[in-house]
């Protein structure tokens, strides 16, 4: 009988610390990593590389089904590898972002990418970072964590990130945008941003990164010992 690889899902809103936590857990456990938020950007970039029309659902589905992508975390840095090439920077361009929003609108593309994401489930295990990993993509995952933080704290973290990159930021505007996105994400009809019924909800508002990682790893190891 073939062993089924365990999955730890980390869901939650932007700015709660999912990316940092997932990279740390993947490195600590030496597990595979899935950054579901980057998947649509990677597909969009692959389409641009292969001159596939991003407005054609029929052309995109086979590309999505066989998308050659993997995620590697080394010393806290995430590398996105598309067809053997590090495209971590390339997927962050505005051209790719615009194309990603187009490809994400197609139902059959979303279905193909859902299957592709599930294919990341390989031994020894998978850390899945996203918004609906525990509710839609891996509903049978033995460990589910929903990571949250106050909208004010998430706006503050985002402001610091942008300031480090040299951008001038209005905190109140940033906070309003985050609250608006939260409301939209949590109330949408398809795959709303809510904790799975069996998820541990962790609030990172007052936790240091080290405390957050320790709590999550401790919980995961306890659950996996019982799984």
UniProtKB/Swiss-Prot annotation:
EC number from the UniProt entry: 2.7.4.25
Gene Ontology MF term list: ATP binding; CMP kinase activity; dCMP kinase activity
GO biological process: nucleobase-containing small molecule interconversion; pyrimidine nucleotide metabolic process
Reactions this protein catalyses: CMP + ATP = CDP + ADP; dCMP + ATP = dCDP + ADP
Subcellular location: Cytoplasm
InterPro entries registered for this protein in UniProt: Cytidylate_kin, Cytidylate_kinase_dom, P-loop_NTPase
GO cellular component: a single term: cytosol
Key words of the record: ATP-binding, Cytoplasm, Kinase, Nucleotide-binding, Transferase
Binding site for ATP: 12-20
Membership in a protein family: Belongs to the cytidylate kinase family. Type 1 subfamily.
Protein name: Cytidylate kinase
Taxonomic path: Bacteria, Pseudomonadati, Pseudomonadota, Gammaproteobacteria, Enterobacterales
